Amino acid sequence: MRRIKFLVDLGCDLTDVEERELDFLHNIEQWFSGGGSGVYDHLPIMQGPKADEEIQARWWSRISAADDSIDCKECGFNNCPFARARENAATADVVIANHHLVATDYVLRDKIDFSLFAVKGEDPPEILIIDEAHDFPDAFRGSFETYLSTHRWSRLNKDIQKTIDTVSWFAKGNEDFMSRALSLQEEYLGFAAQIEANIKALFHWANTEMKKRSTQQWLMFPGDQYPNLKEIREPLSRVRGCLYTAMQLCDDMKSWASVKEDEEKGVSLKHQTKLLGRIEERVSELDAALCRCAGLTEHYRTIGATGDAVWFDGRKFTACPVRVADKLAGLWDSYENVILTSATLFPFPQSDGFDWFRDEFGFTRGEIVMGVVPSPFRYFDQMTAFVATHPDLKASNGDTRAQKIAEFVNRAYKYPGGIMVLFTSYHEMNVVVEHIAPTVPDDRILLVQGKHGGKADLLARFKSHGNAVLFGVSSFWQGVDIPGDALSTLIVAKIPFPRPDEPLIEALSWLAGRTAWKTVIVPLTAMTLRQGVGRLIRTENDRGYVVITDPRAIGKHRWFLKECLPVPLYETK
């Protein structure tokens, strides 16, 4: 963001940046200057031209300090919340961090012996406490995920060109050094052009293959490897040679170019050498991503459960390890004591649930104590649960089903307090919104995920209004705390079975074979459903209704719902 402001101040042409994105960045700058947290989920409703949630998330990734291609080590922005949080964590006695930061800390300690939670030379904290621990394996898995996109290469290419140009600036005034610098620039641009063309060819091939399969997400399996991968990897290896040449040039110019150096502003050959070294690491990481994502070198069907599920969504390839239990065991071993807490740590509070937990979380060695703490809530007095069995609510009924869900929302209006409706897909949610929007009473407001603001902003408005209607998908099934009458009716549109074509679900199911239903689908569904229903009762004084508009809950899955809910399930048409 600071670079864009700098370019604008210089009068540079920014026509390659979409006007809506510039408006978005301007709003971000105003938000942060006014005390904004810098966290994506806390984004307020943006003024100006609107963009859908996917486009806005892509804009955000270009300025996020958490992006894989961002290097914060030499950042001179003293007010950066990302850097400030890391500095505070390194000197604190108690560190409160999110799951991703705990996972990142472990990876850094394992790779380069560097901890985010301790100053150099000191041991990391002795005790690790993870709340909402049911979610931790996914966050941990993400630390070992890699991706391949045109944007990743474009960003790396620009950084390499900028760094080589800066090295050339130091060479001005010396004929020999300048000749070497110009030769280096020309050589790099040639390799970069080859990589650019071949990456475009890779993505054209992938999109063509995806269209053949008539799918919006291509799950890749052995045999789907890109046949011309070496045409990208070979010039990429030559780029490493260019970077080493640039480092040697920096070393040779040190005594001659010292007059141009300014350490405080980071304008020095020493700084450029460090920068070139880190860029070389990014080139190696891109090469590894090419192998895993397009070459399928670590696919789970080739090397087993620790291998990758790989997929292409039209914009990028992703490779993600399927099972990380062995790596989790290494994390637990790095702390003297580990405490995990969650209302849904075990899919079921019995032996099957405990066994699943041990296997999934990597507790295969050492002493472990597991238990279920009694709830402080009187669920039989505080919650009443219904399942709606009207024939129109069958999953195959499409728009008719959406109309019937809208009718249940309309009936809930006569009860005081807020209404939350949890969906398993954006499509069904948006169809129901079309039916419900014209009928919202004057004393209520309709808040829809992806249309009326970020998660934090929607929840704040929902709580403060006290009589609102909130429609949410995925992230609203958990991590939502709305005590009191602000939430008195919770409608669950459908039992949240994971989609079988989700990459990790497909991989886990394939590895589990005939036991997939019992060991994969049921535990994951149970935890999601229990999390969703848990949004209703947050204090000992809360009361309300749960309505599940999925007739399967009273049919073949009745036993399953009985295990998930803390109260009996009543039938209603």
Regions found by a protein language model. Give the residues of each.
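A substrate-engagement module of RecA-like helicase motors
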Residues: 1-93, 100-103, 158, 165, ...
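A contiguous, basic/glycine-rich beta-loop/short-helix subdomain that forms a polymer-engagement track
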Residues: 59-90, 95, 103-118, 246-383, ...
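Signature of the SF2 helicase/ATPase Hel1-core->accessory helical subdomain module
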Residues: 67, 75-94, 98-250, 343-361
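Conserved RecA-like ASCE P-loop NTPase motor core of nucleic-acid helicases/translocases
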Residues: 340-343, 417-429, 547-549
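Conserved RecA-like P-loop NTPase helicase motor core
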Residues: 388-399, 450-554
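Conserved interdomain hinge at the start of the Helicase C-terminal
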Residues: 388-424
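Conserved helicase motor "Helicase C" RecA-like lobe of SF1/SF2 P-loop NTPases
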Residues: 424-450
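N-terminal targeting/trafficking signals and adjacent low-complexity tails
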Residues: 547-573
